[in-house]
Curated annotation (Swiss-Prot):
One of its GO terms (cellular component) is viral outer capsid. This strain probably does not use sialic acid to attach to the host cell. Residues 512-778 are annotated as: Spike foot. The keyword 4Fe-4S does not apply. A motif (YGL motif) lies at residues 450-452. This is Outer capsid protein VP4. It comes from Rotavirus A (isolate RVA/Pig/Venezuela/A46/1985/G5P13[13]).
């Protein structure tokens, strides 16, 4: 029989090479994982910037900050803070454009009453009134005048415990910090001037250069102090001209030749980037009356956009995916009209978001051999929207709320798979923190849960946006006209969602092209792995590796997991019987096939309770049928035959997508199944949907359904797939009339009798088989 392929996969799917298992761990998508938070918890790759570990006191260590630089007069770059670190009171810095801006920053020690002090400002002796009533904090005071002949006016003050102040040219204005540490912030309006780009700074103390983005960096220095300089004894300031050596900090967007040989050159690319991304999701509704949802989950989302960088229009492409999701569920009850969500995904503080970024600039043309990869990005908050679950009757439950903030946590190389091309790209990893508000589902007990649910993660936004910059050094050919190929060795994730989606659509469309007479013949063949996959191009060359991949994927299927659980249950049942051999209960007679020992209470059990019990039993009858095969045809024979036919007809099937397709087919083909057991003239039939019938073969007259007898028969008698179910049999008998022998043959799913009815163009039998074929969908 064709179902041999499933038994063969179940038998062989537990043998796999260790190297294959290790390789799969790094590439397979994980939907329900336990996270151990850490700086690089989610990748098997080393961090980009290695720490220095323990450092001897005599070792010189380059500080994290850009600086310190010696006092000098210079013109600072726009959008960069000049962070002043004076050691003593007095004039800290002089800033002017020699037109309408003369600004000086004065530092006053703590506990100074109001008094006049003499300072030398721009080469002139000037008396200024200063005061600092704080007992512990130092005070930075801004004095400004608008022309050379004006007097200085006190404009701004900063009370500081860290003795740090900063100035920056940005947006046509000059900004300094104001307020009181640890809550100091940049001025809201700044100092207006007609020619702010020409402002130069004469620093009278050591200073650092800090970029404006991310905004929190300089603010944290002002309020919390400079970061520790590790174990160095002395920090020696250098001339500002030494800053030219650190080439990646000279400008935001530039290409620098680091080294060059006859065949290769090293190019350093510095870029500021705007990352736009969005989440994708899928909401799957269960069958039935319309009150139940089976899945709400995240999916990878591609997004293409353009933005301007230094006057140049950039085309960018991002792919957003999540890892470490948390599975939630809601069950409103066991009735068919009770609201149920079997599984919905939520990302929280133990989750990660990956954003793969590519643009059409020179930096991404030859991104194969890369070193010194670093990035600096802002954070962003993602807030969830509302989703209304449309029920057939009654008020609609609404899931709303939820928010998380994304914080940069690392960068690696990756490859994006778009609809047309594979792109070498950068993967930015973000750790998550939960934010207000929590999410809830109205008209349920679900309330005040934190995280971002997958139901509406974009909240009507077209995209989320993150600004930042990156720097890398790439080894490329010396001639810019050459391009190196994409290297799969640097691929972090290969997203097959698009290929699988197209293949599923093709498979579902092929259902109408299957000839039923040929299908019955194919279902009778003993299909093994080689004959099943023989229609795929290149199978002979890669048969071993492909079969291994199929078995590894099948090992994690629901069918394989059910076999494992059943094996454990049978073992438990056997040990229980050996301990209590004198007791015969429903639990021991039905054993692990039924699990109804606690469900069958008495003969007055309500109909809905019987439905629940029979549905529970029926879920395991597929395994019972596979374990004890009869001569009749079963649902898995039809499922495997349809799978074989579609594989042969498919134009998109490939070895890399085959494992997913075979596994999905074993789980999703023919979801509505019914099984029967026979006791002389009586037949008991139950379906996975909870429907059950008991009837006599002679008259097709229904009789009361005895759950206990049904459970006993399942243990002692063969289980038969109800290919032609009770309703179809009764309809066939009422309209055409069938003999008792024909009825028995159809009840046993005899393939020869089925073929005869199909060849005779019997519309009732053909309609039933067509219905089963149409249920073979992915």
């Amino acid at each position: 029989m064709a179902s041999l392929i499933y038994r063969q996969l179940l038998t062989n799917s537990y043998t796999t090479d260790l190297s294959d298992e290790i390789e799969e761990i790094g590439s397979s998508k994980s939907q329900d994982v336990t996270i151990n938070p850490g700086p690089f918890a989610q990748t098997g790759y080393a961090p980009v910037d290695w720490g220095l570990g323990e450092t001897n006191d005599s070792t010189t260590v380059a500080p994290v900050l850009d600086g310190p630089y010696q006092p000098i007069t210079f013109t600072p770059p726009i959008e960069y803070w000049a962070l002043f670190a004076p050691n003593d009171k007095g004039v800290v810095a002089e800033l002017t454009n020699n037109a309408d801006m003369w600004l000086v920053i004065i530092l006053v020690e703590p506990n100074v009453p109001q008094e006049l002090r003499l300072y030398t400002l721009f080469g002139q002796q000037v008396n200024l009134t200063i005061e600092n009533t704080s007992q512990t904090k130092w005070k930075f005071i801004d004095f400004r005048k608008r022309s050379q002949n004006d007097t200085y006016i006190l404009e701004n003050a900063l009370l500081s415990e860290t003795k740090l102040q900063a100035a920056m040219k940005y947006g046509g204005k000059l900004f300094t910090f104001t307020g009181d540490t640890p809550n100091a912030a940049p001025q809201e309006w700044g100092y207006t001037t007609n020619n702010y780009s020409a402002i130069s700074i004469k620093s009278l103390c050591d200073f650092y250069i800090v970029p404006r983005l991310p905004r929190e960096t300089c603010r944290n220095y002002i309020n919390q102090g400079l970061p520790p300089m590790q174990n160095t004894r002395n920090v020696v300031s250098v001339a500002l001209s030494a800053r030219d050596v650190i080439s990646q900090r000279v400008s935001i967007n530039e290409d620098i030749v680091v080294s060059k040989a006859s065949l290769w050159k090293e190019m350093q690319y510095n870029r500021d980037i705007t990352i736009r991304f969005k989440f994708a999701n899928q909401i799957i509704k269960s069958g039935g009356l319309g009150y139940k949802w089976s899945e709400i989950s995240f999916k990878p989302a591609n997004y293409q956009y353009t933005y301007t960088r230094n006057g140049e229009e950039i085309t960018a492409h991002t792919t957003c995916s999540v890892n470490g999701v948390n599975n939630f569920s809601y069950n409103g009850g066991s009735l068919p009209t009770d609201f149920v969500i079997s599984r919905y995904e939520v990302i929280k503080e133990n989750s990660y978001v990956y954003i793969d970024y590519w643009d059409d600039s020179q930096a991404f043309r030859n991104m194969v051999y890369v070193r010194s990869l670093a990035a600096d990005l802002n954070s962003v908050t993602c807030s969830g929207g509302s989703y209304s679950f449309a029920l057939p009757l009654g008020n609609f439950p609404v899931m709303s709320g939820g928010a998380v903030s994304l914080h940069p946590s690392g960068v690696t190389l990756s490859t994006q798979f778009t609809d047309f091309v594979s792109l070498n790209s950068l993967r930015f990893r973000f750790r998550l923190a939960v934010e207000e508000p929590p999410f809830s589902i109205t008209r349920t007990r679900v309330s005040r849960l934190y995280g971002l649910p997958a139901v509406n993660p974009n909240n009507a936004k077209d995209f989320y946006e993150i600004a930042g910059r990156f720097s890398l050094i790439s080894l490329i050919p010396p001639n810019d006209d050459y391009q190196t190929p994409i290297m799969n060795s640097v691929t972090v994730r290969q997203d097959l969602e698009r290929q699988l989606g197209e293949l599923r659509n093709e498979f579902n469309a092929l259902s109408q092209q299957i000839a039923m007479s040929q299908l019955i013949d194919l279902a009778l063949l003993p299909l093994d792995m080689f004959s099943m996959f023989s229609g795929i191009k290149g199978t002979i060359d890669i048969a071993k590796s492909m079969a291994t991949n199929v078995m590894k994927k099948f090992r994690k299927s629901n069918l394989a997991n059910s076999v494992s659980a059943l094996t454990e249950s049978l073992s438990d049942a056997a040990s229980s019987i050996s301990r209590r051999s004198t007791i015969r209960t429903i639990g021991s007679s039905a054993s692990a096939w039924t699990e109804v020992s606690t469900a069958v209470i008495d003969t007055t059990t309500a109909t809905n309770s019987i439905s629940t019990q029979t549905a529970t039993i029926t879920k395991r009858l597929r395994l019972k049928e596979m374990a004890i095969q009869t001569d009749g045809m079963n649902f898995d024979d039809i499922s495997a035959a349809v799978l074989k036919t579609k594989i042969d007809k498919s134009t998109q099937i490939a070895p890399n997508t085959l494992p997913d397709i075979v596994t999905e087919a074993s789980e999703k083909f023919i979801p509505n199944r019914a099984y029967r057991v026979m006791d002389n003239d009586e037949v008991f039939e139950a379906g996975t949907d909870g429907k059950f019938f008991a009837y006599r073969v002679e008259t097709f007259e229904e009789i009361p359904f005895d759950v206990q007898k049904f459970a006993d028969l399942i243990t002692d008698s063969p289980v038969i797939s109800a290919i032609i179910d009770f309703k179809t049999l009764k309809n066939l008998n009422d309209n055409y009339g069938i003999t008792k022998q024909q009825a028995y043959n159809l009840l046993r799913s005899d393939p020869r009798v089925l073929r005869e009815f199909i060849n005779q163009e019997n519309p009732i039998i053909r309609n039933r088989i067509e219905n089963l074929i149409m249920q073979c969908r992915l």
